[in-house]
C-alpha cells in the first residue's frame, strides 16, 4: 500500500536506538512542540497508515505540533522483526532522537501518543525517558 502524505509531510528514515533503520512520516510545524505517534499491533495489521494514527496526526498538526508517525521494526519498510513490545521502546527512543537532531533546540515539549499496542509501547517509553513531557494513550491494553 502506498504511503499517503499530508501537505508538507516528507518520508524519512532514522535509526532505532539499537541501530535498525525505521521509516516514518515527518510534518514540521513552527511551534516548539513535537509528538511521536505509535501505531497498533504489527501482527494484526497495525502501521503508521492506521486511520486512528492518521487522525491523531492531523489533530496534532492542527494544534501546531511537529508530528512523526513511523512504522515499528518489521512493519512496512522498517527493518527488523516484531519485539513483543519491549524492543519497540528502542524504536520510540530512536524517533525522539531523530526529532531532537532534526529540530535542534527548538522543541521544548516532546510528546508520545499511541493507539492500542502503540499506547503500551508509548507508556513504557514515557516512564523511562525524561525527554517526554506528556503521553497520550488511546485504547491501551489492560492485560499486557
Residue ranges of each PLM-predicted region?
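An N-terminal hydrophobic leader/cap segment in hydrolases
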Residues: 1-15, 20-27, 110-112, 117
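Primarily recognizes the serine-hydrolase "nucleophile elbow" in alpha/beta-hydrolase
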Residues: 90-144
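Serine-hydrolase catalytic machinery in alpha/beta-hydrolase-like enzymes
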Residues: 15, 20-105
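Homeobox/homeodomain signature
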Residues: 2-4, 12, 38, 107, ...
Amino acid at each position: 500500500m502506498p504511503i499517503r502524505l499530508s501537505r508538507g509531510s516528507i518520508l524519512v528514515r532514522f535509526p532505532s536506538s539499537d541501530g535498525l533503520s525505521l521509516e516514518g512520516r515527518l510534518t514540521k510545524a513552527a511551534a516548539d512542540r513535537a509528538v511521536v505517534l505509535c501505531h497498533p499491533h504489527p501482527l494484526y495489521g497495525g502501521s503508521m497508515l492506521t486511520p486512528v494514527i492518521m487522525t491523531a496526526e492531523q489533530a496534532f498538526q492542527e494544534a501546531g505540533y511537529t508530528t512523526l508517525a513511523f512504522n515499528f521494526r518489521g512493519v512496512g519498510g522498517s527493518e527488523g522483526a516484531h519485539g513483543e513490545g519491549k524492543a519497540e521502546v528502542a524504536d520510540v527512543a530512536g524517533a525522539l532522537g531523530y526529532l531532537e537532531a532534526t529540530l535542534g533546540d527548538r522543541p521544548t515539549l516532546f510528546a508520545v501518543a499511541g493507539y492500542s499496542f502503540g499506547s503500551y509501547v508509548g507508556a513504557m517509553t514515557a516512564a523511562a525517558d525524561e525527554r517526554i513531557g506528556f503521553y497520550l494513550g488511546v485504547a491501551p491494553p489492560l492485560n499486557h
